Amino acid sequence: MNVEQVYKDANALLEGHFLLASGNHSSRYLQSAKVLEYPQKASLLTDALAEMIRENGIEVDTVCAPALGGVIAGYELARSLGVRSIFVEKKESGMELRRGFEVSPGEKIIICEDIITTGGSALKAAEAIEALGAKVVAFASLANRGFCKRVGGSNEAKSECKLPKDVPFFALEDFTFEMYTPEECPMCKEGSTAIKPGSKG
């Protein structure tokens, strides 16, 4: 499957001048919400991700996603794997289970996101789950922004990657875009103004 083409077909791979959450700028942006608005495309992607996880012998009881961005991807991956789906939500520091969700000691959990950049949110989700006695057996995402090394990927982990090195990370594709500080951004130097994509438009 050509994952990049699936994103392009769904208008989920944007080109322009973007202000990222990190404060850096980029000429490309992944908007996974656009690819996930089509249940058939979401199923296609998570079925492929589930197959990778199975092929690597990962046993899992539950998929847990950080809200909000990971919820649909996590739910669909759980469906593809035939297990239950839960999510954690932000609190003042870190994340927590709410809404009556529970995990058991030793329960095998995969943390799933739509996109993993440095893995910061996924790591906070893992810490919340492991504090309750469950075991995180893998991290997964549809797309990897290239800071973390995925199973089968050619990219090496960069210093910004927050995922633990001893837990496998599965993703369908590496999307490595150039990022610039505002001071070094060539688009800014040409007079362009960065726009903030994501939840507000």
From Swiss-Prot:
Keywords: Glycosyltransferase, Magnesium, Pyrimidine biosynthesis, Transferase. It comes from Sulfurovum sp. (strain NBC37-1). It is an enzyme of class 2 (transferase). Its EC number is 2.4.2.10. SUPFAM superfamilies: PRTase-like (SSF53271). The keyword Ribosomal protein does not apply. Its cofactor is Mg(2+). It catalyses: orotidine 5'-phosphate + diphosphate = orotate + 5-phospho-alpha-D-ribose 1-diphosphate. GO terms for molecular function: magnesium ion binding; orotate phosphoribosyltransferase activity. Catalyzes the transfer of a ribosyl phosphate group from 5-phosphoribose 1-diphosphate to orotate, leading to the formation of orotidine monophosphate (OMP). InterPro entries: OPRT, Orotate_PRibTrfase_bac, PRibTrfase_dom, PRTase-like. It comes from the Bacteria. 5-phospho-alpha-D-ribose 1-diphosphate binds at K90, E113, D114, I115, I116, T117, T118, G119, G120, S121. Homodimer. GO terms for biological process: 'de novo' UMP biosynthetic process; pyrimidine nucleobase biosynthetic process. Signal peptide: none annotated. This is Orotate phosphoribosyltransferase. CDD domains: PRTases_typeI.
